[in-house]
Amino acid sequence: MKVLKEKTQSLCPVCRETISARVVADDGNVLLEHQCPRHGVRRAPVERDAEFFAAVMTRSRNKPSPPPYLTVFPTYRCNINCNICYVPRRDPAMDMSLEEVGAVLDRWPHPDVFFAGGEPTAMENLPQIIALTRAKGKRPYIVTNGIRLAEPRYVAELARNGLHGVSLSLNALDGKTLEATDGRDYLDAKLQAITNLKRRLRRFAICFSLVRGVNEAEFGKVFRFALRQYPFARSFHAECLPGIGRSINGKRMFLSEMLDLLANSAGVTRSRLLALAAQGKATVGPYGFAADYRDLGAPVTGLLPAAVMAVTKAIRSRRPDMRVRVIAGPLTDSVDLEETWSATTTMVVSKENPVMPLWEYLIRYHGGRHESA
């Protein structure tokens, strides 16, 4: 056994108290060891590739600055019942009033604010929330399943009120697989939503939630689909969050495996992706990786329509200027709080919690409420 990190912090999966921990390598696997005074000693896997983990783990004990993005959960309501959901509660008491949202916006110093949930389009006053955000000099985005965005008039209303961007979930391009993840085949509605966004908003992201053993084969298909939506689609975000909220099977995928999926889909190697981090062209930690697609060195022949390729000739190496991010979330018994900061893309606030990092919010408030679909 080899100690990779002598001291870090974790959360007890039972009482959620912050506790001391360390990270060790044992027989090629990476384990988090921690001891809660009330609930004893635990060992849980962090990564199955010790060499990979040693290359990407954070060595500085200095906490990085909070990201300049805020995600507000104004509601826990939703208009569908997915088999995977990190906030499966549907408590209307968690709805935030327009005044409460305004107070949050007044305290947030940065311009970019995302509204998620739940499903933000389930709130009848979402257009007013967007208008309020604009009036306070900020750029409003929504994180959505896209079902209501299949309505052209609704998209037009959101655009008129100042919606800046959309992150739309698309977990498969196959109806049967989408039914397994989302509860029903919503593919037609999601594709119509994308068409409407191209007409009215012209800026969106594609988000893919990976479930091990269910939609792994769809990763590359959705990734290449996102590339074909450029220049309207400006980012592709893939994540695996098996220990949060409602899950189909609770099976985890480690970041080394997620990067292998990305590398295979992009036509590069995992070592190429890690080299980008060494060159300062990508960010990487045990839970997340992010880079610009045009820096991956991936071939693009056949990925984009000829008309789009003609427009993108001016872009370096004829590659889409798209942000690519993959996240492999920790389970509740193996969270390294220091490393979660390296994968924290946003701060989070809802009616039940103050502003805090995304991962701390998910694990403290939803990590222990695992449900099988």
Where are the regions a protein language model picked out?
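Radical SAM enzyme core and accessory elements
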Residues: M1-R61, T283-A373
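Charge-dense, low-complexity intrinsically disordered segments
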Residues: K2, D95, A180-R184, N249
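Conserved alpha-helical substructure of the radical SAM core
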Residues: G28-G162
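Short acidic, gly/pro-rich beta-turn/loop elements at beta-sheet edges
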Residues: A44-V46, C82, P152, L178, ...
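Short coil/turn linker and secondary-structure boundary residues
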Residues: E47-R48, M96, A150, L173, ...
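A short, flexible beta-alpha/helix-coil linker loop
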Residues: R89-P92, L173-K176, G243-I244
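Radical SAM/AdoMet-radical enzyme domain recognition
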Residues: G102-A116, M123-C240
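Radical SAM enzyme [4Fe-4S]-AdoMet core and its adjacent flexible, acidic
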Residues: D188, R199-G329
